[in-house]
């Protein structure tokens, strides 16, 4: 996908294919109105007011056959998402009818849009910057209301504003350095001394480091916590999964080794998306299929952000329990003592004190798991502060880290007594790195790659 501006008219189906109440076929470009009018029987779309919805029928211009009864939205540039003329044909939902209309539009001169091309045009035409474009996809992919809140704030420009303001301050500092170098005789320009440059770079660094501190929380809310439920066979792992999901996804029996594979499901725990991985019970076994499940369980444990270790309170600790306690001790771990509704036989003195006693059967203390997750990952500070700007995108986080490193290089140079003009390079690099976040200084290949990840019609 080229990032040069293209002014042809593109089209795509913007709703998921399949049965539904409505389907939407979108057009964007200079000829959007003319192409839509060529297949529309109703008002003249080239003469209606902007941002109106118009009733009519889509017809095949070659045969005069009615394809569907539709409502057509007309939105004129520049007050559209792409800042081009946009037409949206609202059809009855269904694969056949939306595809038929799409093919008609292509035959009339529209081009099939590439993935993300509508949003790409919004970016190229200055409607959104790169962070806002990425926020569109984050909204689509958001698994919880908290993740959506962060994405909507980013789409609204909160991160863009912070980055742009910082870039402007850095640019002002660079300009002051340049004036001091090129016109040292100017008395009305403040001298960029070593002390003043140190003060400014430390200010920039502090701002970016504060932003980085939001990354852990933001990334969790955007991508979720990979959560492995581990334990020896028949301690209640699958029952816990079903309890958290509030539906029966895993097979629950009294037969050890019933779960032969890894089961993955997403669940919303107080705004945090947890990718729950119900693993096969980890034990020594001669069953080849179960052995494969056990190996996958160990791999899931190693890769997990959070480990829920389930023990059976109604039985004494086994060697398998002790092995799992050792195996998971370096993880973000919550130990769950299940089956506390039965007579307790487990040796509590051999276990860490911060375990949670639960009964999956009676739902006892399941809510405490949610509280412990908040304590482990959010320091009990709550999930989303209303006015805060969060980093949640791995690309943004990586670039902010690089920008901080460049500022550290400036401060290191100042400490070594390097001349101010020699430190311009690192300060300029900081300015360029921040520009990659918003797209002002992003390479063409990056922009192409980012938009290729979008869905068709967006």
UniProtKB/Swiss-Prot annotation:
GO biological process: tRNA methylation; tRNA wobble uridine modification
Residues noted as binding (6S)-5-formyl-5,6,7,8-tetrahydrofolate in the record, renumbered to the chain: 26, 88, 127, 458
Subcellular location: Cytoplasm
Chain positions recorded as Mg(2+) binding sites: 238, 259
EC number: 3.6.-.-
GO molecular function, one term: metal ion binding
PROSITE patterns linked: G_TRME (PS51709)
Domain of life: Bacteria
Binding residue positions for GTP: 234-239, 253-259, 278-281
Cofactor(s) needed for function: K(+)
Cofactor note: Binds 1 potassium ion per subunit.
Any single Gene Ontology cellular-component annotation: cytosol
Residues given in the record as K(+) binding sites: 234, 253, 255, 258
InterPro entries per the UniProt record, alphabetical: G_TrmE (IPR031168), GTP-bd (IPR006073), GTP-bd_TrmE_N (IPR018948), GTPase_MnmE (IPR004520), MnmE_dom2 (IPR027368), MnmE_helical (IPR025867), P-loop_NTPase (IPR027417), Small_GTP-bd (IPR005225)
Domain TrmE-type G intervals: 224-378
Major place of residence: cytoplasm
Alphabetized UniProt keyword annotations: Cytoplasm, GTP-binding, Hydrolase, Magnesium, Metal-binding, Nucleotide-binding, Potassium, tRNA processing
UniProt-listed CDD domains: trmE (cd04164), TrmE_N (cd14858)
Oligomeric and partner information: Homodimer. Heterotetramer of two MnmE and two MnmG subunits.
PANTHER family noted in UniProt: TRNA MODIFICATION GTPASE GTPBP3, TRNA MODIFICATION GTPASE GTPBP3, MITOCHONDRIAL
Described function: Exhibits a very high intrinsic GTPase hydrolysis rate. Involved in the addition of a carboxymethylaminomethyl (cmnm) group at the wobble position (U34) of certain tRNAs, forming tRNA-cmnm(5)s(2)U34.
Family indicated by similarity: Belongs to the TRAFAC class TrmE-Era-EngA-EngB-Septin-like GTPase superfamily. TrmE GTPase family.
Protein's name in the database: tRNA modification GTPase MnmE
Organism, scientific name: Streptococcus pyogenes serotype M4 (strain MGAS10750)
